[in-house]
Amino acid sequence: MSQEYTEDKEVTLTKLSSGRRLLEALLILIVLFAVWLMAALLSFNPSDPSWSQTAWHEPIHNLGGMPGAWLADTLFFIFGVMAYTIPVIIVGGCWFAWRHQSSDEYIDYFAVSLRIIGVLALILTSCGLAAINADDIWYFASGGVIGSLLSTTLQPLLHSSGGTIALLCVWAAGLTLFTGWSWVTIAEKLGGWILNILTFASNRTRRDDTWVDEDEYEDDEEYEDENHGKQHESRRARILRGALARRKRLAEKFINPMGRQTDAALFSGKRMDDEEEITYTARGVAADPDDVLFSGNRATQPEYDEYDPLLNGAPITEPVAVAAAATTATQSWAAPVEPVTQTPPVASVDVPPTQPTVAWQPVPGPQTGEPVIAPAPEGYPHQSQYAQPAVQYNEPLQQPVQPQQPYYAPAAEQPVQQPYYAPAAEQPVQQPYYAPAPEQPVAGNAWQAEEQQSTFAPQSTYQTEQTYQQPAAQEPLYQQPQPVEQQPVVEPEPVVEETKPTRPPLYYFEEVEEKRAREREQLAAWYQPIPEPVKEPEPIKSSLKAPSVAAVPPVEAAAAVSPLASGVKKATLATGAAATVAAPVFSLANSGGPRPQVKEGIGPQLPRPKRIRVPTRRELASYGIKLPSQRAAEEKAREAQRNQYDSGDQYNDDEIDAMQQDELARQFAQTQQQRYGEQYQHDVPVNTEDADAAAEAELARQFAQTQQQRYSGEQPAGANPFSLDDFEFSPMKALLDDGPHEPLFTPIVEPVQQPQQPVAPQQQYQQPQQPVAPQPQYQQPQQPVAPQPQYQQPQYQQPQQPVAPQQQYQQPQQPVTQQPQYQQPQQPVVPQPQDTLLHPLLMRNGDSRPLHKPTTPLPSLDLLTPPPSEVEPVDTFALEQMARLVEARLADFRIKADVVNYSPGPVITRFELNLAPGVKAARISNLSRDLARSLSTVAVRVVEVIPGKPYVGLELPNKKRQTVYLREVLDNAKFRDNPSPLTVVLGKDIAGEPVVADLAKMPHLLVAGTTGSGKSVGVNAMILSMLYKAQPEDVRFIMIDPKMLELSVYEGIPHLLTEVVTDMKDAANALRWCVNEMERRYKLMSALGVRNLAGYNEKIAEADRMMRPIPDPYWKPGDSMDAQHPVLKKEPYIVVLVDEFADLMMTVGKKVEELIARLAQKARAAGIHLVLATQRPSVDVITGLIKANIPTRIAFTVSSKIDSRTILDQAGAESLLGMGDMLYSGPNSTLPVRVHGAFVRDQEVHAVVQDWKARGRPQYVDGITSDSESEGGVGGFDGAEELDPLFDQAVQFVTEKRKASISGVQRQFRIGYNRAARIIEQMEAQGIVSEQGHNGNREVLAPPPFD
């Protein structure tokens, strides 16, 4: 058979047939094509040439080249994101074809058809699900064309959620049709995987990792004495390990080399001298009789089996483990006393001299420095030396303990009945961790069952002691707090024989446990709270959580443990009796509640071990726990401060009153907390100064909850009553000394509620005066009961004492900052955190509030309102009906036209009409109002010429108008890719495409519309778009707001050159400064030889790169106070925004018209741009001079065609719908474009303004709004240089004729009306003529020239 197997392993090369050669070659090519396709899909770039884009000006980015770009674009267009799965599907198909290439089975065409149907269903539903739920990829729909068709079809019928569910159902059916898998099988497979993962995770968490390196724990100076003792014990442990190794080698002689007797070795409990079986596994390690995995009996099994390996053959390692457990327990709870390991008596059995089967028996009497070995008599005593330290420490408990000791004495003696002959004692130390705690749910019946088992003991020595078992007294034993009334039973005196000094084996793990036990005991001593006024403890309530096994000192556990144990169950009974002796105060009624951490189904029901790790001082300090010395110093400091507070010498009357109010508030909060529990504090505001303390407390609370749930929090308080199992002891439980870890972490669990206190800083100096809350916890250690401090464990779970943990946690934070905290009551006296008397709501956009500086260079789009994710689909059926209705209404007016196309938009829908031959478009324009009436719409706008089409447009409003959000317009490639810092967004056109304009190319903008038409919203959208595009060093603003409402919200942003101008006199000066700045920039640009500001800035940047800045060519030493020659710097664009241009014209008059005209004519090259907005589109405001220099205009809704012609030079604005609906006449274009303006809320404007305020303060330029040379700042002329050249001749004419009129000057000098009016105004300013009277006449004040 092996020869045949060897021949099969030889690999031979076989020739393929021609068909298979061709097939495999074809499959290889297809796989390579799939890899290439995946690379093309992953490297897709929208700028590459493709089906949707044929022109490009950059190199191809796609890894597949031009074919890859075309193919990727096509697949994305058709399938969307599902295109990424196509290469995977191709590779899977190739693999399937290769695997089934040799099968010549009959082809089931019905099955093939079902698979094809399943594939189609999977493709369609996957694309539909992607279209409904996934975001779009690049500029493609997420589900491609297929998904878009499905989503648009299903959403009107089933909505998005219903469509998703329907598509999921079809997808599931398609998967079954394609693969043939049943969903029941899929669910079972998934469940099996999940259970395997959970089983693996649970088995990993049950691993015993309690042994760690000694370096993990910090060694303190106070442990030097213990370290010397531990070294001495380690030497003995090494000697014993050598003996155990020899026994291991001897045991290996009985092991089958092939390992065929592994199962028998694992599950056997026989002695080593039994020839047929051994107690070792294949690895030579002794089998653990208490292991829940390898034990074959349950702890609650009532009958006795004389061939039971657990009860009939106890291994020799059991007394060693018992002694080790007792040693660890004793040292962990009696650290001040020298740790001693007692020796139980040796069983009287003949054994070979090379295998000393010595049982370790504790000798009664005072503790000695060295342990002794005593042979075990036939009835050895139950009182052991391990109980002596606890009894001496708790002297008041000796009387009530004695009557209870003989009560469970038979259970303690039962393990002695069987001598054992285990050949080796190599049990691992972690064996005792599996403590059989939960096998006795009922107090009386459980113990009776154990007594019945003990009657089957083969020895009669212990049968006479069954009279001491009183099941009837078991129930009141744990209910009555005075067990002294029971009659004690006299025990036989222990026989002390000659012993020789020796010690039980101490393994390395036991040494670690000893050190950790000493650390736990020392930490428990550290955290004894400072004594306070004594108060009687509250009575114990039955609803409290039962203390853990380690709550009672495990020193007593070894007293009742027999070295010749016949089973785990009887040893557990004995340790339960010792637990009753050690802790009578906590003996409460038993209960049958379920116990945690029990593995059922195999062996006795034993609890899982609990991992314990004692935190170091450094970790405790990180948790906020401090040492007793520090707490004592804090207590002294609090006492001194309390005395100082009581004296009241350093506080005035106001401070004392504030402290009294704080104390009343604290008492009220405490009362409310006691009434409503801990949840009351969650609603109280936290003081900002305690933010760090609150964070520490929260971290400590979370860590404590984790530790509590992991180690001792499996059973909530009050969930299960007390049971006898809570006080059971065993050798396993002795080493599992997890009792002190809960009191150690109690300071961590308790400060949970501290940050939520209403007056945390003020409460701290009042803590010494409130000893009532801490008394139930601090009084417990003062009682003369040894296990009393452990009884504090369930107290942190009581809801009626939430104040004590908070005060306890605040103490570590007081020593350093305690003195400043006494000044905290002065803070509530301050009415506002702001240093101002103004109300916070009166702050202009929160100008003085502290702001956090953002990290992004420009504001985030998250500040703006996002558009809704679900957009209502277009009702094509309704549009078809409207098209037929339009044709019918036109036919009513004898106009034959056909609707050839329609373009739905967010606000209006354009119907394209193909007029019959000979029909003029003017006829439809004249019928616009009649068509609106007949079609029952608000307004109808007729577009006579559509660029590029021979049709006439008819624009009708939609029934449901959609809002155009600024965020969706800004988040667009047209806006992002525009490099100009003056890019502004207007909204969307009738097709829903964003409209983006460049203010630098306009170069000025005139905005007009009636009140409420959306003019101010449009201006805000332009400003915000520039704030999202440019930095302050690129664009600066001069804002003129006569109404003091629209642009004043931008006060304080760093883009402003000066404060928002609200006085029209200052507005004229600002415009004049712009004219002077324009002239200065022209001089600088001419000196550098550039044509515009962009070229000027490029020259400056080039000089900076050369490290040779350009000096100012027009600077003179007397021009400024600079010591050095100033250099030229980068000049920003300046945008002058006037919100109400008509008010400026009316207030200042025609004087600013010249300034605006000059800026409109020349300021474009200098980088100064005007945005003029007005709600009065009349000819006296928008004059011909202004219109001639501002070609770019925006018209919102106006009242008449005349106003529309004033703005746009054509009609159409009167037919707009309002609320942002506008006509935009761009540069170099005479045809206006209908745009639906982006909507901007006030909250969005405030958010963006606050974001820019947080980035920096504005750097204002002095002298923009002030003009010292003009008279009152409104003259508009700078002395004689501004006078008209004909001024002197006109003055001579007026003084000679003695008549001053604008028409007379105009006729005399043949000039225009505006120039003649300015000359007369100049005469008025010079005092030559008087002001205009009520009849329009003026008087000549100057004398005649010849007088």
From Swiss-Prot:
SUPFAM superfamilies: P-loop containing nucleoside triphosphate hydrolases, Winged helix' DNA-binding domain. ATP binds at G1012, S1013, G1014, K1015, S1016, V1017. One of its GO terms (molecular function) is ATP binding. It is a multi-pass membrane protein. InterPro entries: FtsK/SpoIIIE/SftA, FtsK_4TM, FtsK_alpha, FtsK_dom, Ftsk_gamma, P-loop_NTPase, WH-like_DNA-bd_sf, WH_DNA-bd_sf. PROSITE patterns: FTSK (PS50901). Homohexamer. Forms a ring that surrounds DNA. This is DNA translocase FtsK. It comes from Escherichia coli O6:H1 (strain CFT073 / ATCC 700928 / UPEC). The lineage of its organism: Bacteria, Pseudomonadati, Pseudomonadota, Gammaproteobacteria, Enterobacterales.
